[in-house]
Design a protein with these regions (language model features):
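Phosphate/pyrophosphate-binding catalytic cores of soluble transferases and nucleic-acid-acting enzymes
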Residues: 1-314
């Protein structure tokens, strides 16, 4: 094989509630593919409803990797993801199958496709404890404000309430004196490791997306989200990442009897809409995304055609 040959990889990206899972399955059916999930929460076992995890029925028998691999008390970083996804890509390609990335965690998708090399610096002794103490004393908003001043680019990619990632970014900055974005630039290889097609799903009218998000939340509640969220709340000290996740933390005031269920539900819908906006901002800044109208009757056919053309160029 030509030494310059690069494995083809297809990615399906976009904000929440745009039909990424279904499109990924359709592509896998037509092009003999296997799916690698690019969702930072779907890796956790037992967090099924709040993460909109793909169901066995929805997979239609297509292998889905990177789902249900850790218990919620375990940490999982973008460096962990790129290592896992790199190994999966090799295995899938060796089986003569097409690797299809599906998910809305932009940092995961971009880091993998761009071949970012992560080096895990060891934090100075006591730094993590110091940051945790500062968080307890000052609050999350103050810590996020510090990150905005130190590393605006990293802050823009992190939700203010995601205290785990805020502290991790601050830890990196204080330990190395460098921004995360600087590390990322230094760790980029001279050329990308894969030949990729990135399909982005979105709706031309924002109101359509927001209605779909609201409907999805209602369906999650019907499916038993409250019970799942209560389990996270009861284990919030050990389920650190899950306790910060959209879909769970919005209901904590309800369990603490400080807010009615209706108010918490509305808060979740608003948080999900805001998250969709941040996802769109991220993916709009990525190079080479081929955007598709998720609501168009021929959206799947267009995606199949684009993928067929992409593979034919190989």
């Amino acid at each position: 094989m030509d030494a310059s040959y690069k494995h083809p990889v297809v990615a399906v990206v976009g904000p929440t509630a745009t039909g990424k899972t279904a499109l990924g399955v359709e592509l896998a059916k037509h092009f003999s593919g296997e799916v690698i999930s690019c969702d930072s929460m779907q890796i956790y076992k037992g967090l099924d409803i709040g993460t909109a995890k793909v169901t066995p029925e929805e997979t239609c028998g297509i292998p889905h990797h990177g789902v249900d691999i850790l218990t919620p008390d375990k940490a999982f970083s973008v460096a962990d993801f790129t290592a896992m996804a790199g190994k999966l890509e090799e295995e899938i390609s060796a089986r003569k199958k097409l690797p299809i990335l599906v998910g809305g965690t932009g940092l995961y998708v971009q880091s993998f496709l761009y071949g970012v090399r992560f080096t895990e610096e060891k934090a100075p002794a006591g730094l993590r404890e110091q940051l945790a103490a500062e968080l307890a004393a000052k609050g999350g908003a103050a810590m996020y404000e510090e990150l905005k001043q130190a590393d605006p680019e990293a802050a823009a990619a992190i939700h203010p309430n995601n205290q785990v990632r805020v502290l991790r970014a601050l830890e990196h900055y204080r330990a190395t004196g460098k921004k995360l974005s600087e590390q990322k630039a230094e760790s980029l290889p001279p050329e990308r490791p894969y030949r990729s097609l990135i399909l982005g799903l979105d709706f031309p009218e924002r109101a359509v997306l927001y209605r779909r998000i609201d409907l999805r939340v209602d369906k999650m509640l019907e499916a038993g989200l409250i019970k799942e969220a209560e389990h996270v709340w009861q284990n919030r000290e050990s389920f650190r990442t899950a306790a910060q996740a959209i879909g769970y933390k919005e209901f904590f005031p309800y369990f603490e009897q400080t807010a009615p269920l209706e108010a918490c539900t509305e808060k979740l819908k608003q948080a999900s809409r805001n998250y969709a906006k941040r996802q769109l901002t991220w993916f709009r800044h990525m190079d080479g995304v081929v955007w598709l109208d998720a609501g168009a009757p021929d959206a799947v056919q267009t995606a199949l055609r684009k993928t067929s053309e992409f593979l034919a160029k190989g």
